Amino acid sequence: MNRIVFALGLALTSALTLFTPALSAAPAPEAWEIWDKADNSSEAVIDHSLWQAVLDSHLKPSADGINRFAYKALAAEGADTLKRYLAAMAKIDPRNYNAAEQQAYWINVYNAVTVNEVLKYPSKNSILRMGERFFSVGPWDDKVFEVAGEELTLNDIEHRILRPIFKDHRVHYAVNCASIGCPNLGAVAFSGAELETQLANQERDYLNHPRGLTFDKKGRLQLSQIYEWYGTDFAEDEKALVAHLAERHATLGDKLKTYTGDVNYDYDWDLNSAE
């Protein structure tokens, strides 16, 4: 029996190793047309206070500049506030709001759903080991949220709504995949009124953190794999990407402008757990 269990575990580990490289090719943005509608005359505001309450009580900033989340504590409490938030968001048709409110809505929903997904797999130490299917490499293709009569996956929200409809590269700094390598889960819920400032802050913070951009001991440029997976969301090619980053980095701009070496990409998929 132990040999069978060991063999199954080995097979799963091998499968994860085999399929993880596929993550280097992210889904292309392809608009889900039914969501490409907005009432830009609307001044109505979506209430994200329940999500803010979850962030206030369970998001833990760390000295290393990485925000971690107390998943186990939230699960032990029953996650009632998170559940109520997602239930409230499921009753809203975001198309009745202006574009900024919609974008904030989808980012918050994505992040809240991701937290909820992590709670379903308390023994897993990486989101890559989560998901409903036997050989899942993450929960991104699971149906995890329903709104306006449509069932959505996390990939739907990111690649069929946020990226193609709003066309803002900074969404990659806003959505959080529950991993150390990911841009921080923001401490303040996104809102239409503050969206521009919030996205700018998320971009600045990640770009200027070593997990976003750094030079190794040999002087080689190392970037987050986000810039590899979604490179054309930022620039037309790698050279233009480095120039794009040079314009935005607080201290390394001049060094980046003259850099002509290879670019290495890295990402830490460990769970961003505070426990």
Can you name each region flagged by the protein language model?
Residues 1-4:
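Positively charged n-region of N-terminal signal peptides that target proteins for export
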Residues 7-18:
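Bacterial N-terminal signal peptides
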Residues 19-26:
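Signal peptide processing junction and immediate N-terminal pro/mature segment
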Residues 26-275:
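Interaction/scaffold regions that mediate signaling and macromolecular assembly across diverse proteins
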